[in-house]
């Protein structure tokens, strides 16, 4: 037993997670009614979601309060990369539609009581109102835009504090980070539970009716992750980007795929940034910000499903209109964190460009919820892994260096 525990401790986290995935897969097929196994996944995701807001709040305050005057954080570059990648992903989705035009079977009403926003202005109004939320309420509700806003305010205010106060804040941040490490070490067990739940509840029948749609969605996201993002990274770094790209997909994308939550993956991304030796002053802000606005996967989902609806209804779309759709999708995707239901509930906003009624648009949303088990997992993996990727790319960029 001791030999087994020793070997387990020496095994890398990714290998442990792989073992957990395989065990969860078999248990989901063999004993699908053993619901207690699924509880392990819920506890793992719940733990990550619970600690992530506190982690972001303490890290940002600590980093800003001790930030050196004249220190470079690369935040403008990172935000520029987030926006560029999101728009590029939306544009790629349009091109994919011309190559693989999809149609949908719009006969199942959307099984959701959520109401879509009436337009982009409503999306950003909601986002702005969330920013000025009560800071305590923001932490309890995991409202990261508000958490970031108040953490920045408190961090700047604490710059004039004495060193002992700053050290105390750093101690809180370090203690929170240690708790995060303990939770992440439970990832193999948690992901085993998540895989079990997914297999036992959904099976693999979903691949039959919506196989082509799933293939196009996943294929487009893979193309963006393995081709588009590396091109952007190469332009910025002027060196082979794939070791960094694959490291981010392996260490961040895999956990994000199973948790299906960018918020829950924030602690994982923070740890990866630390392992990559990135500047803490930068990544403590860029990672939670990326979880809120870096939404390449959401832009792909919005465009693919919207254009599939357009094809189904026989509406002709010229490229200038499709380009405008890319702009709308990119802007809407950046506000996805401000909308209950995320990217799927923003589809009616995009559909409105083509005069598609809200009833039809909500049927498209219904299709999105049906394939959401796979679509949402891949979308989150792409979104979350690129938070780390572009934070690292900005720091390693050849631009702005003497």
From Swiss-Prot:
Gene Ontology CC terms, in alphabetical order: plasma membrane
InterPro entries, A to Z: Na-dicarboxylate_symporter (IPR001991), Na:dicarbo_symporter_sf (IPR036458), Ser_Thr_transp_SstT (IPR023025)
Superkingdom, natural source: Bacteria
GO molecular function: neutral L-amino acid:sodium symporter activity
NCBIfam families: PRK13628.1
Keyword Amino-acid biosynthesis: no
Topology in membrane: Multi-pass membrane protein
Keywords: Amino-acid transport, Cell membrane, Membrane, Symport, Transmembrane, Transmembrane helix, Transport
Reaction(s) this enzyme catalyzes, per UniProt: L-serine(in) + Na(+)(in) = L-serine(out) + Na(+)(out); L-threonine(in) + Na(+)(in) = L-threonine(out) + Na(+)(out)
Example GO BP: serine transport
Entry's localization field: Cell membrane
Described function: Involved in the import of serine and threonine into the cell, with the concomitant import of sodium (symport system).
Sequence similarity: Belongs to the dicarboxylate/amino acid:cation symporter (DAACS) (TC 2.A.23) family.
Transmembrane segments: 19-39, 43-63, 86-106, 138-158, 179-199, 212-232, 287-307, 327-347, 354-374
Name of the featured protein: Serine/threonine transporter SstT
């Amino acid at each position: 037993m001791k030999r087994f525990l020793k070997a387990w401790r020496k095994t890398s986290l990714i290998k442990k997670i792989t073992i957990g995935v395989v065990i969860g897969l078999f248990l989901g097929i063999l004993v699908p009614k053993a619901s207690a196994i699924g509880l392990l996944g819920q506890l793992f995701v719940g733990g990550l979601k619970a600690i992530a807001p506190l982690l972001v709040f303490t890290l940002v305050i600590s980093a800003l309060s001790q930030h050196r005057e004249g220190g470079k954080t690369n935040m403008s570059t990172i935000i520029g990369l987030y926006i560029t990648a999101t728009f590029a992903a939306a544009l790629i989705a349009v091109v994919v539609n011309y190559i693989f035009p999809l149609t949908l079977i719009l006969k199942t009403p959307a099984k959701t009581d959520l109401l879509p926003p009436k337009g982009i202005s409503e999306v950003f109004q909601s986002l702005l109102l969330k920013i000025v939320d009560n800071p305590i309420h923001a932490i309890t509700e995991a409202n990261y835009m508000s958490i970031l806003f108040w953490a920045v305010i408190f961090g700047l205010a604490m710059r004039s504090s004495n060193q002992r106060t700053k050290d105390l804040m750093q101690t809180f941040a370090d203690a929170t980070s240690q708790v995060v490490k303990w939770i992440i070490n439970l990832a193999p067990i948690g992901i085993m539970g998540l895989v079990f739940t997914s297999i036992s509840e959904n099976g693999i029948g979903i691949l039959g009716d919506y196989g082509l749609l799933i293939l196009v969605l996943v294929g487009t996201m893979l193309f963006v992750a393995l081709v588009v993002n590396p091109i952007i990274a190469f332009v910025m770094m002027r060196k082979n980007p794939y070791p960094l790209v694959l490291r981010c997909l392996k260490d961040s994308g895999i956990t994000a795929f199973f948790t299906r939550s960018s918020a829950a993956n924030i602690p994982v991304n923070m740890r990866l940034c630390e392992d990559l030796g990135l500047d803490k002053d930068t990544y403590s802000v860029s990672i939670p910000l990326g979880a809120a606005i870096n939404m390449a996967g959401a832009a792909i989902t919005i465009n693919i499903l919207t254009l599939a609806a357009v094809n189904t209804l026989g509406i002709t779309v010229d490229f200038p209109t499709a380009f405008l759709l890319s702009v709308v999708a990119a802007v809407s995707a950046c506000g996805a964190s401000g909308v209950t239901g995320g990217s799927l509930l923003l589809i009616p906003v995009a559909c409105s460009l083509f005069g598609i009624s809200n009833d039809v648009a909500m049927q498209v949303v219904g299709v999105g919820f049906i394939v959401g088990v796979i679509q949402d997992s891949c979308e989150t993996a792409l979104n979350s892994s690129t938070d780390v990727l572009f934070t690292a790319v900005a720091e390693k960029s050849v631009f702005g260096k003497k």
